[in-house]
């Protein structure tokens, strides 16, 4: 059986499946997913055909199938600036301990965790220290790094910490976060302006007000105008990090309109084949909660390379053993 067909993974706090996509591309098999949000589940089912289990806190670890890799973009609101950085004082922050109990029971070969970069500094670094200690106590050798979606060809400044761990120390030593940065291009994710529905555009009055407010600023196209609640506007060639709240109202393509659902998915690196089955408002929330797919793809491919080389190495050792001792038996 090919290695990819034998590798199984679980997708915790799955959202709309952004972390899963690169592992599906590798041919790995998802044997369990968990997501409690009904609309996210609707999107997940439409795109992957699997029905996620509900609230992970109510699922016994022994009811989760055996797996080789655990994936989890565990809830980040408790650690984010927008979420007031409550950390483990927020029930969403304690979701890490759900991961811990599953790891303790199943001991998968590898783990990939994703969260906001503020996780590393929350409570003066103590929260992150606890997480690393727990993973170490479970036998995982961990590496981590803050990565930016901009460096993966996406016109979105989205910084996230990626944590990768292996039970095998030698596997961990082989892993690194080295990658070749890619240029981003805002135009590449924008839809044809002639096909944008009229309700995505601001009124002429509001658009003129923005033009007047930015009369002293250099304007270029395409661009994203970032307008804060005070009305201050920054004009950039990329978007700030997509969020789940109302901030999408202040991300304006060329200062004229909001991003479309397809553009929001493209900002996260989702393929155009990805189905949209919920409202525009829901897609805004779901993409704000999701991940930069190309970022995860880079990490997934590195994990795959290590597991594949290990499998090939084991096969080579077995073959050498047979050749060596087989000859001795024959000569005897």
Placement of each model-derived feature along the sequence:
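Conserved Class I SAM-dependent methyltransferase catalytic core
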Residues: 94-157, 161-166
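Conserved short-loop catalytic and cofactor-binding motifs
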Residues: 87, 116-119, 151, 255, ...
